[in-house]
């Protein structure tokens, strides 16, 4: 990774999540028979054991030590480690902040990509422990968070799905993608 010039890695949900979920859980949009189950390969939308690294991703029985060694190896090579968290609907924000504190303090995670409830963005951005931690959200109100003032430390980032979609079209060479690409390229608010 270092030889490729990569300076950060974002891990999709790497905490212990339940792989077998019912199709009636909120993660699934379409209703289905209650007895039908699906494998949740990615860790999105279900309740999880947020404080533990995913044991099935580890090569040994000690997933905790292995995860810590991985983060240390990334840091030794000048690569930051960010984690994506998808908290289940209804997860209290205080609990979510405790989870982020745990991963930052125990594993020295450099940042978090938080998927789901946008209200967590404001609380996380004001949290004393996370003040210098990279925080990435899908849609947050920078003006409300910063209250019209310039941020003292620019740690908030927006995961912009529109940009992601249009940059992919542009890179593939899709016809008519240039104007959309330039629009999203220029749209970079001062707040983040």
Predicted feature locations:
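Aromatic- and acidic-residue-enriched carbohydrate-binding clefts of CAZyme catalytic domains
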Residues: 21-76, 89-107
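Active-site-proximal loop/turn and secondary-structure-junction residues that shape catalytic pockets
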Residues: 15-17, 56, 85-89, 118, ...
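Active-site-adjacent beta->alpha loops and helix N-cap segments on the catalytic face
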Residues: 64, 118-124
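Short catalytic/ligand-binding loop motif for oxyanion handling, primarily in non-cytosolic enzymes
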Residues: 17-22, 91, 120, 143-147
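Conserved alpha/beta catalytic core and glycan-binding cleft of carbohydrate-active enzymes
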Residues: 108, 125-192
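Surface-exposed amphipathic alpha-helices with a cationic face
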Residues: 2, 68-77, 124-130
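Catalytic domains of carbohydrate-active enzymes, especially glycoside hydrolases
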Residues: 1-15, 37, 106
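Hydrophobic faces of well-ordered beta-strands that scaffold small-molecule active sites
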Residues: 9-11, 81-83, 112-114, 135-138
């Amino acid at each position: 990774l270092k030889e490729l010039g990569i300076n950060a890695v974002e891990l999709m949900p790497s905490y212990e999540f339940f792989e077998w979920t019912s199709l009636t859980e909120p993660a699934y949009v379409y209703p289905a028979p209650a007895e039908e189950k699906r494998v949740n390969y990615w860790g999105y939308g279900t309740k999880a054991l947020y404080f533990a690294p995913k044991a099935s991703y580890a090569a040994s029985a000690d997933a905790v030590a292995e995860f810590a060694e991985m983060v240390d190896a990334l840091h030794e090579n000048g690569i930051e480690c960010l984690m994506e968290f998808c908290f289940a609907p209804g997860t209290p924000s205080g609990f979510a902040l405790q989870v982020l504190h745990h991963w930052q303090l125990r594993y020295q995670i450099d940042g978090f990509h938080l998927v789901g409830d946008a209200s967590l963005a404001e609380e996380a951005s004001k949290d004393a422990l996370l003040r210098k931690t990279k925080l990435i959200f899908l849609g947050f109100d920078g003006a409300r968070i910063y209250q019209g003032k310039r941020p003292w430390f620019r740690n908030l980032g927006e995961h912009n799905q529109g940009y992601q979609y249009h940059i992919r079209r542009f890179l593939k060479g899709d016809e008519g993608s240039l104007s959309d690409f330039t629009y999203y390229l220029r749209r970079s608010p001062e707040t983040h």
